[in-house]
Amino acid sequence: DGMREQLRQAKPDCLEDLVALNALYRPGPMDQIPHFIDRKFGREKVEYLDQRMEPILRETYGIMVYQEQVMLVARAIGGYSLGGADLLRRAMGKKNVEEMKRQRAVFIKGAAERNVSEETATEIFNLMEKFAGYGFNKSHAAAYSYVAWQTAYLKVHHTACFFAGNLCLVMDQGDKMRTLIDGARNCFFAAGRERQ
């Protein structure tokens, strides 16, 4: 499974890593996962198109992951208000061509007022546009990741209870029951003994 392989490679050692990987594992930003992993382990240098982006993107190794980061970059580089940044995020998500042309001009003008070249501003806007279309908001990614972490903990440390509880939930769904029973067999036999 793709996400499992990404987790093996990333070796998350904190909840923030799980949250970021969860948010990255989506159609738009998925191609950034190898960069996230390489930057985490120092195999790739973390670079920022503008140093004002560093405090915003530091926790994700310079990669735009969350909708909130898009909004903060719009504020720091393009001079947007909070409300304006949220409108930009929404426009990017809807992919309205005319509105995006207008927003691009506003962003580049605001960036120029903050001594950012048009070339750099365009590059930053393109990154924002790419991620805002598919970006997850951080609180949703955190909630999903926390539940996934709890579920994994229960599966590893309280295996029998984990499978018993899940089987109770899907008793009337044959395919799901078979999948869970196979998973339980694999867990118990992989351990070489019955686990509690």
Task: Cite the ranges covered by each PLM segment.
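Noncatalytic, beta-rich nucleic-acid-contacting surfaces in large DNA/RNA-processing enzymes
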Residues: 1-196
